[in-house]
Amino acid sequence: SYAFIRQNISADLLFNGNNKSNTQDFDHYLRRLGYKFKNESKDCGGYIVLKNKKICLAMDTGSSPNPKYTQDYQSGALSFEIISNGKKLITNCGYYKKNNQNLNEISKSSAAHSTLIIDDNSSCKFIKSKDKLILKTGLKITQKNSVFEKNYWKINAAHDGYLKKFKSIHERNIEFFPEQM
């Protein structure tokens, strides 16, 4: 996954517990020892990443993990980021990891990400457990696919995070025409 995200993009995607990181020493270490990773996949670990030399389009397309692994999980399913020439155009807030319960809770909410909220509700629910917020009710990705052609990119995905309360499936479809940039 390091080759898929960090080495392919060379930027920090602020999905699910990630924040700005400095991997320069680690990258130098890998180069010094001759490690080279190549990842041609567009879909890995619950993320779809489409990119060319100028633009990167990434979307969180993963279902919620098991609750015991969710202390840093954010309810940002189907959120996306766009990077152009190394600069973020659309980004998520990242995750606030320090000891401020209010900021932890806000950064876990769907509202803190480039995704849908309905009637001030996040797609997932969290509960407090041993001074940490963990997942109470998660979501499942019900469909996902992508198209990556020279002149046309598309990511389509849907989840059931609003099904029980609002009887609604959230589907997001992003189309991009790289040659029009």
Model features per residue range: what roles?
Residues 55-144:
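Catalytic core of carbohydrate-active enzymes
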Residues 39, 69-71, 75, 105, ...:
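Residues embedded in well-ordered secondary-structure elements
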Residues 43-56, 122, 126-179:
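Extended, loop-rich substrate-binding clefts of extracytoplasmic carbohydrate-active enzymes
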Residues 22, 94, 121, 177-178:
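Alpha-helix initiation/capping motif
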Residues 1-91, 95:
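Carbohydrate-active enzyme catalytic cores, enriched for enzymes
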